[in-house]
Amino acid sequence: MESGQKAAAELLKMHPRPDAVFAVNDPAAIGMIKTLQKAGIRIPDEIAFVGFSESQSALIIEPNLTSVAQPTFEMGRVAAKLLLEQIRNYSETIGPHQSISLQGKLNIRESSQRKDQMHIQ
């Protein structure tokens, strides 16, 4: 949260300010939101927020934080599988680069929706 508080202090100096912030993780987003709210900024009416980690804190803060859920279990499973394959097929040369994409999930909540645009999904 401390990094979010520092980022919010910098954001308050900006003119014009951004319409939205996509934070590196939920704690940073929450730190920014709390700091900006203390400064009188209305979230999401003035600045919308999205976090990245789908922490339990996303549901505790007001407004509830929109957040991207990462498929952490699947990441671990794929990483372990790749590591075991490398161990089984060990050689002195490094194999070709491999890129793997996993599907995250955007959980839309109040922090990213202006009151006049909110609807129940």
Q: What is the role of each PLM region?
A:
Residues M1:
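Conserved active-site histidine-acidic residue motif and adjacent donor-binding/catalytic loop
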Residues A9, K13-I120:
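Flexible loop/turn connectors
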